[in-house]
């Protein structure tokens, strides 16, 4: 199963651990999108920054 992740809010003023989580998902700027494999590391990072991103499941 794969998921599409999109950064919808900026990182200005966010904590360093949140910025690292967004970067580890491969997102750099607002409106960046990545399609990632669903695994525990990715899901943990998504959970940490769920207020900054938009997530969709992709077949």
UniProtKB/Swiss-Prot annotation:
<dbReference type="InterPro" id="IPR016082">
    <property type="entry name" value="Ribosomal_uL30_ferredoxin-like"/>
</dbReference>
<comment type="similarity">
    <text>Belongs to the universal ribosomal protein uL30 family.</text>
</comment>
<keyword id="KW-0687">Ribonucleoprotein</keyword>
<dbReference type="InterPro" id="IPR036919">
    <property type="entry name" value="Ribo_uL30_ferredoxin-like_sf"/>
</dbReference>
<dbReference type="GO" id="GO:0022625">
    <property type="term" value="C:cytosolic large ribosomal subunit"/>
</dbReference>
<dbReference type="GO" id="GO:0003735">
    <property type="term" value="F:structural constituent of ribosome"/>
</dbReference>
<comment type="subunit">
    <text>Part of the 50S ribosomal subunit.</text>
</comment>
<protein>
    <recommendedName>
        <fullName>Large ribosomal subunit protein uL30</fullName>
    </recommendedName>
</protein>
<dbReference type="Pfam" id="PF00327">
    <property type="entry name" value="Ribosomal_L30"/>
</dbReference>
<dbReference type="InterPro" id="IPR005996">
    <property type="entry name" value="Ribosomal_uL30_bac-type"/>
</dbReference>
<keyword id="KW-0689">Ribosomal protein</keyword>
<dbReference type="GO" id="GO:0006412">
    <property type="term" value="P:translation"/>
</dbReference>
């Amino acid at each position: 199963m794969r998921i599409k992740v999109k950064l919808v809010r900026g990182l200005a003023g966010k904590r360093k651990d949140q910025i690292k989580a967004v970067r580890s998902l491969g997102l750099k700027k607002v409106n960046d999108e990545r399609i990632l494999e669903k695994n525990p590391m990715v899901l943990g990072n998504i959970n940490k920054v769920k207020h900054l991103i938009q997530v969709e499941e992709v077949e």
